Regions:
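A generic beta-sheet turn/junction motif
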Residues: 52-54, 235-236
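N-terminal core-entry segment
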Residues: 13, 19, 73, 89-90
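Active-site helix/loop module of the DD-peptidase/beta-lactamase fold
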Residues: 38-41, 53-89, 99, 113-145, ...
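Catalytic loop of the DD-peptidase/beta-lactamase superfamily, centered on the K-T-G motif
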Residues: 1-37, 95-96, 112-117, 121-124, ...
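Residue-level preference for non-acidic, small/hydrophobic
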Residues: 17, 43-46, 50, 75, ...
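Well-ordered alpha-helical segments within folded domains of soluble proteins
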Residues: 45-47, 102-109, 151-155
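Generic detector of well-ordered secondary structure
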Residues: 52, 67, 77, 109, ...
Length: 270
């Protein structure tokens, strides 16, 4: 892919990438078997596993988790009222989109309680083994400490495109905006009103400037991580992209990633 030529301008070493075209064909760059911590892209996996628990009736989106009147649905969509890392809620649920690692740790604790196994084991049984993500595992917080590789994350992207582990209806709900019209901040990116988010994935919407590209449709959903990781799927073009870098997300990514993503979409849409 010619789009991969743009990566030479990135200040990131050992970059590995996978772009999946509308036919499901994967185009790769770099060592896609190399493992690293995927940072907040972990939240996509944690959320998908939680939705599996919801579908098998172990819990429900209306289950009370955390502060008073807070539900699993609130926490999955960063509407639970918890700050980035604080354990004390700062607003009531459903009032603001406050991106929260704490919320995802509460989710993992809840799934552990209802499943009666560790969350690491739950991820392995519910996600990693069924999808063949052989190099992936949880090594700490469910919010940001999953270790994986691009090959494994490409399998996750295929699941997000064509869900097999959860129903198409649940997947559609999860990848569209929940608790609409909430304003909030995407850390490292900016404040948006509304700040669109699903049950796990961020939804592109009309956010600008943004880490996604201008060619990404409003319905594009995914996540990036502070370790220089990203995964998104664009339902309009039916194109997905996954990447792991060894340079933390910063201004360089806000500049280079959208250019690269636009090039990927342009090239694979032909």
């Amino acid at each position: 892919m010619r789009a991969f030529d743009l990566v030479r301008e990135w200040p990131a070493s050992n970059t590995s990438l996978c772009a999946i075209d509308r036919h499901g064909v994967a185009h790769t760059f770099g060592d896609t078997t190399r493992t690293s911590r995927i940072a907040s892209v972990s939240k996509l996996i944690t959320a998908w596993a939680t939705l599996i628990a919801v579908e098998d009736k172990s819990t429900s989106l209306d289950a009370k988790v955390g502060q008073q009147d807070c539900t699993l649905a609130h926490l999955l969509s960063h509407a639970g009222g918890y700050s980035f890392d604080g354990t004390v809620p700062i607003v009531t649920p459903g009032r603001k989109r406050i991106y929260s690692n704490t919320g995802y740790e509460l989710i993992a604790n809840h799934v552990e309680q209802v499943s009666e196994i560790s969350f690491a084991d739950f991820l392995r049984e519910a996600i990693f083994e069924p999808l063949g993500m052989a190099k992936s595992f949880l090594n700490g917080s469910a919010a940001h400490d999953i270790v994986s590789c691009v090959d494994d994350l490409a399998e996750l992207a295929l699941e997000l495109r064509n869900p097999q582990l959860i129903s198409a209806i649940t997947a559609s709900v999860a990848t569209t905006t929940q608790f609409t019209e909430l304003e909030g901040v995407v850390p490292g990116v900016g404040r948006f009103d509304p700040c669109n988010w699903g049950f796990g994935p961020e939804v592109h919407g009309a956010k600008h400037p943004h880490w996604m590209g201008s060619r990404n449709s409003a319905s594009t959903f995914g996540h990036f991580g502070g370790a220089g990781s990203f995964l998104w799927h664009d339902p309009t073009s039916n194109i997905s992209c996954v990447g792991l870098c060894e340079v933390e997300f910063d201004a360089w990514a806000m500049h280079h990633w959208p250019i690269f993503f636009d090039s990927v979409i342009d090239e694979l849409s032909r």
